[in-house]
């Protein structure tokens, strides 16, 4: 923690005279990687000591996380990384809250599956079927995370090699889930 604080005071003391117009601060060190909790206090410290916009980053996975980061750090903007994996609507949900004060509901099962299928289709158009189907396996796993019986479906999709088979598996999974509701 001391290294972080020393680094922040160095940044703050220079007041970024080198022409930087904004700075993004992640509340976690490289050594921490994804472990532990992001230290939003460091973002707040930088914000309090510089005159340029500060972009906060780290541990924003839900609308509530974004609200808490803004309130705790007073940062000017938020950058989202892993929180958008399998969750691209997080940006719309945060923007909606910022404009209305209302938190939109989580996307439905159908929205998640249809978004995964659209993402897969775009990936195939961009990279070709062979590469896209393989690269999309991890993305589809993120879309399905937390859904009923998703571990089985993820395992099955990880063995599929064609676009059409992945789409069929996603559609049959969605129908199975809707039948159980």
Q: What are the residue ranges of the model-derived segments?
A:
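Glycine-rich, proline-tolerant flexible connector loops at the mouths of alpha/beta enzymes
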Residues: 25-35
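Alpha/beta catalytic cores of nucleotide-metabolism and tRNA/nucleoside-modifying enzymes
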Residues: 9-22, 34, 41, 45-56, ...
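Single conserved hydrophobic/aromatic residue that forms the stacking wall/gate
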Residues: 1-11
């Amino acid at each position: 923690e001391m290294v972080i604080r020393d680094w922040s005071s160095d940044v703050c003391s220079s007041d970024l005279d080198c022409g930087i117009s904004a700075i993004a601060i992640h509340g976690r060190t490289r050594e921490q990687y994804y472990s532990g909790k992001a230290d939003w206090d460091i973002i707040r410290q930088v914000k309090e000591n510089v005159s340029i916009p500060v972009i906060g980053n780290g541990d924003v996975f839900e609308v509530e996380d974004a609200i808490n980061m803004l309130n705790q750090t007073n940062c000017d903007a938020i950058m989202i990384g892993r929180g958008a994996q399998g969750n691209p609507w997080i940006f719309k949900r945060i923007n909606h809250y910022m404009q209305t004060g209302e938190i939109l509901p989580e996307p439905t099962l159908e929205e998640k599956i249809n978004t995964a299928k659209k993402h897969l289709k775009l990936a195939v158009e961009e990279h070709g079927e062979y590469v896209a189907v393989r690269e999309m396996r991890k993305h589809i796993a993120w879309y399905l995370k937390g859904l009923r019986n998703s571990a089985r479906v993820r395992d099955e999709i990880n063995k599929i090699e064609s676009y059409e088979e992945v789409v069929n598996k996603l559609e049959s999974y969605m129908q199975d889930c809707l039948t159980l509701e």
